[in-house]
């Protein structure tokens, strides 16, 4: 069946839209992809919503605080606009699409407190597009005692089920997460490994006003302060066994505050590489290769540091004729189809749930 997946990640770049054909098992055919950037005004509102959400004891729309209301309206509207434009440009009628997988925008992820919060009105999206929508993918997992993340390991398995195993798929978004893939769908281990683009973006934004370090050019001119990398790696998270997950706010740029822009970028990039390397020690067997998706694969300096730290092949997912910018959006299309068929999307070794379980709320049309 045809399904659309929507993703707006913690980097707050915009809305990614992907179209795939899948049966919710091994059959997956990515078909098309487009990205719709948020405006600077949208990004500012979403950042403030994230800041406020992290001060709360639980998800709660406070009547006198309009910021999160406004943020949810922005997220919903931008996703509606993106889907309608995508359908039009691809000459697709809404009847052709079985389901939309709508991740929403994470504004706080606190599995330690028993909750996670993705804003965006799935019912409104379904009504506006006249296509059934699956949203709220993470809550069921967290309520069952899981981490609620990462959720894409089963999609990574579908993409590489016929490849030589074991291998690992590394997604470099705001946060980095890794999936170790063994022989079958029950042989998956996954976790967040640490910050990826998020801290570097924050550093570059604070120092230059730019949104990110394009191609890792700033970092390439800097010197890595290994003592600071070691200090950041001493945090408890990095010695914890998977499954484990992070909120983008769990780490800050304070550790590199006294460095030059170049040295700070280099040190934070090395921190990402070292945290990924550390994660390999948790797997039962060293993977034969690391396949990289997500925006971080465009960072030449990060990819080189990963190769140097991991001492194994580190290949962009494009080497396998896939689009690394589309992988997350494709994944939520795939998860939506699995939800329609009531198939599990999270597993004990990927999120820590007690047994394989499905997730997501369906808004039927």
Curated annotation (Swiss-Prot):
It catalyses: 1,6-anhydro-N-acetyl-beta-muramate + ATP + H2O = N-acetyl-D-muramate 6-phosphate + ADP + H(+). One of its GO terms (biological process) is amino sugar metabolic process. The keyword Repressor does not apply. The gene is anmK. Keywords: ATP-binding, Carbohydrate metabolism, Kinase, Nucleotide-binding, Transferase. This is Anhydro-N-acetylmuramic acid kinase. Pathway: Amino-sugar metabolism; 1,6-anhydro-N-acetylmuramate degradation; Cell wall biogenesis; peptidoglycan recycling. Pfam families: AnmK. Coiled coil: none annotated. Gene3D superfamilies: 3.30.420.40. It comes from the Bacteria. Belongs to the anhydro-N-acetylmuramic acid kinase family. It is an enzyme of class 2 (transferase). ATP binds at residues 9-16. HAMAP family: AnhMurNAc_kinase (MF_01270). Its EC number is 2.7.1.170. Catalyzes the specific phosphorylation of 1,6-anhydro-N-acetylmuramic acid (anhMurNAc) with the simultaneous cleavage of the 1,6-anhydro ring, generating MurNAc-6-P. Is required for the utilization of anhMurNAc either imported from the medium or derived from its own cell wall murein, and thus plays a role in cell wall recycling. Disulfide bonds: none annotated. GO terms for molecular function: ATP binding; kinase activity; phosphotransferase activity, alcohol group as acceptor.
